[in-house]
UniProtKB/Swiss-Prot annotation:
SUPFAM superfamilies referenced in this protein's UniProt entry, alphabetically: S-adenosyl-L-methionine-dependent methyltransferases
Signal peptide from the UniProt entry: none
BP term (GO), one: rRNA processing
Location (main, coarse): cytoplasm
Name this polypeptide is given: Ribosomal RNA large subunit methyltransferase M
Subcellular location: Cytoplasm
Name of the gene encoding the protein in the UniProt record: rlmM
Length: 347
């Protein structure tokens, strides 16, 4: 068995399968996607998995929460002895720097959570005894993933820690603080964690910067920016939560976010308005093209059908109309629903 294992939001397997197929074809690697709706993962079977993984950077994949290279598929595992076949399948492999035992984030996969936790505790000492796992986690070495699809069915895969999600299942466990104006705050928190590298976050999100939040009410995204000590112009005809205004970092303008423009260039513009995705993409492109902002994070609400086609169309439309040299990344975040979050920054 050789291929890529990618986790995704349950119900978005067709979109991830289409994305992997299109991207693999673009780089000239043949393969096919194996999945079923609501599995919570896609297995892209190909003979050149390592080469494909190197060309498809995790941060560049839209619908993949995690990207792993499969090294074995085990079926019919004896529940009384799962360790022996796993050790046999790993014979000759290099020493791994960490072990994550996982399951798909799906209705069928979640009941396997307790098995994953307990089995990980049993497998670690066996791997160390066999010389397959370091005594302490070593993030610079490849990470071993055991993904249980059922009690007797598992995929063994490896991750490059520099090119994979740093969270089990690819899900950052963010806590919604009581003072957050809305749950949408988690979207921007996750976007900053996922779409930017630590070095980019440090360089691009600094105290004293200026930003606009279009369609800001009740203030979730504005609040996230103020916690980074960014000055925010919040544009919305609706009200903001009082404690957001009390930060002293927020100017609330009662205006239509689709028509407002700043008097001077801003460091950031963020937008989570509920609107047709193509209309949003065009307006965001105008902001970049006119130089109204240097960097932007915005959401695109996807239709129920042909979501991969709409995603590609909107991103192409944005990049064409922006008329700038940009680094563009997009993800369907864990805290997103029927939408994707897009980052665009000056190249």
């Amino acid at each position: 068995m050789s291929g890529l294992l990618c986790y995704c939001r349950q119900g978005f397997e067709p979109e991830l399968a289409a994305e992997l197929s299109a991207r693999a074809a673009f780089v000239g690697i043949a393969g096919y996607a194996r999945t079923q709706r609501n599995d919570g993962y896609v297995l892209f079977v190909c003979d050149e998995a390592a080469q494909l993984a190197a060309k498809l950077q995790w941060r560049e994949l839209i619908f993949a929460r995690q990207k792993l290279v499969v090294i074995a598929e085990l079926k019919g595992i004896d529940p009384k002895d799962r360790i022996t076949p796993i050790l046999a399948a790993l014979e000759g492999q290099q020493r791994f720097g960490d072990l994550w035992v996982e399951h798909p984030d799906s209705d069928a996969g979640k009941p396997l959570a307790s098995l994953a936790r307990s089995f990980g505790n049993a497998l670690r000492p066996a791997l160390r005894k066999a010389g397959l796992l370091t005594d302490k986690p070593q993030p610079r070495q490849p990470r071993l993933h055991i993904c249980f699809l059922d009690g007797d069915h598992a995929l063994l895969a490896v991750a490059d820690s520099a090119d994979s999600a740093p969270w089990p299942l690819g899900i950052p466990r963010l806590k919604l603080l009581p003072e957050a104006p809305s749950r949408s705050a988690l979207k921007l928190d996750e976007a900053l964690l996922t779409l930017l590298t630590p070095e980019e976050r440090e360089a691009l999100v600094k105290p004293g910067m200026r930003a606009a939040d279009l369609g800001a009410a009740p203030g979730g995204w504005t609040w996230v920016l103020t916690r980074q000590h960014v000055h925010v112009t919040s544009v919305d005809n609706g009200p903001l939560r009082a404690h957001v205004l009390e930060t002293g970092l927020v100017e609330h303008l009662r205006a239509d976010g689709f028509h407002w423009k700043p008097a001077q260039p801003l460091d950031w513009m963020v937008c989570d308005m509920v609107e047709q995705p193509r209309r949003v993409a065009e307006r965001m492109a105008t902001w970049v093209r006119e130089g109204w902002c240097r960097n932007t994070i915005f959401n695109l609400k996807l239709p129920m059908k042909k979501r991969w086609d709409e995603t590609r169309l909107c991103l192409e439309l944005f990049e064409q109309q922006a008329e700038k040299s940009l680094i563009v990344r997009a993800k369907q975040l864990y805290h997103d629903r029927e939408e994707i979050t897009v980052l665009a920054m000056r190249g």
